[in-house]
Structure formats: C-alpha cells, structure tokens
A protein has these predicted regions:
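Predominantly the C-terminal beta-signal and adjacent terminal strand-loop region
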Residues: 136-183
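Sec/Tat signal peptide C-region and signal peptidase I cleavage site
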Residues: 18-23
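Extracytoplasmic loops and strand-loop junctions of Gram-negative outer membrane beta-barrel proteins
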Residues: 24, 110-115, 159-163
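Bacterial N-terminal signal peptides
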Residues: 6-16
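N-terminal secretory signal peptides that target proteins for export/translocation
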Residues: 1-3
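Gram-negative (and chloroplast) outer-membrane scaffold detector with strong preference
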Residues: 43-139, 179-181
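Short N-terminal segments immediately surrounding and downstream of signal-peptide cleavage
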Residues: 25-41
Length: 183
C-alpha cells in the first residue's frame, strides 16, 4: 500500500502543477460502485477537457465474500467534454468520454467454481464515459462507466501466469457514482 500511495501522489502532483492549468477548476471527491470505493481528483484543463485521477479499493471479491482483503488500483484518464447544457436553475450538465491507463493489485474474477484465483498485479487501458452535473453550490455528481482492457499477472506455484483482466471488462456493466467538491 505504500507504493500505491506514492504512485497516487506522483500522479496528483504532476496533474496539479502543469503550468497551463494551475488556475483552472479542480474537484476532489469519493466514488462508489460495486467494483469498489475510492478517492478522485478532477482538473479542468481547458473548457472542453478535464483530467481524472483516481485511487480505488478493488472490493468486488470482498463484497461477495471470496476475499478478506481488498485490492487497490490507481487510474488516470483524459476526458473530452462532448457537449454540455445549463439547466433553468443554473446547474451545468456535461457529457464526456475519455481514455487513459490503470494499474493495481487485486484478486480477479473466477469463471469456474473450482478455479482458484490469486492476488496479482493488473495493468491496462482505461476508458471512461458518463455524465457530470455541476451544481451552483460547488458540488459535482458524476455517473460513469469505466472499463479496463488489460492483463492480470499472478503467481501459480512457481510460474507467473498472465491472462486478460476479467473485472476490467465487467466494469462496463457496473457504473460508478462520484460526489465531489469543486474549488
């Protein structure tokens, strides 16, 4: 977990101190979904794009009782705002999509009942698509899907095994809800 904290710190500091974006809008919050819970940081880079950085406890196996300890992951996506509108009461509604990367350490989904799945590292490309509502009281609520197309590495006996990251694909079906404070 110490490495996890250092990676998140480096990503956050790099994003926060980009020279062209220091005066832009930022938000920090929490995300919830069936796949896990986490902390998020969004940084508006320009009027039509924002950066999303997330650190998440991978809880799927924990929620269904197959693991005692959750895994962890970090992710980074560059999101383009496809369109936005303002409601009658001043709230801004934006539709976005983006791409980036994710990496972490967790237990992957098992397909067969007798299959043993071990903890291991994963990495891959991450997509993100959703809708963000920006309220006039500096609160954002975002609903998004964020699949990861990647690989899962784990040790089986004395061999390192690699296969596609199954939970990354299942995240397409499990939307996440994020509530954040904008400053």
């Amino acid at each position: 977990m110490e490495l996890f904290s250092k990676i998140l710190l480096v990503i956050t500091l790099t994003t926060a101190f980009l020279s062209d974006t220091c005066a832009q809008e930022r938000s920090i919050g929490t995300s919830w979904s069936f796949t896990g819970i986490g902390l998020t940081y969004d940084h508006l880079v320009k009027e039509t794009a924002f950066v999303h950085v997330g650190a998440q406890l991978e809880m799927t196996e924990t929620f269904i009782g197959r693991a005692r300890i959750p895994g962890g992951s970090v992710s980074f996506t560059w999101n383009d705002i496809l369109g936005s509108t303002t409601s009658r009461n001043g709230n801004r509604i934006s539709f976005f999509t983006g791409a980036g990367a994710a990496a972490g350490y967790c237990k992957d989904f098992r397909v067969k009942r007798k299959e043993q799945v071990r903890y291991g590292s994963f990495f891959g490309l991450k997509g993100r698509a959703g809708v963000k509502i920006e309220y006039d009281r500096n609160i954002n609520i975002t609903a998004a899907v964020a699949p990861v197309l990647g690989m899962h590495l784990f040790k089986k006996e004395e061999t390192v095994m690699m296969r596609y990251y199954r939970y990354g694909l299942l995240q397409t079906l499990m939307p996440e809800l994020t509530i954040s404070y904008r400053f």
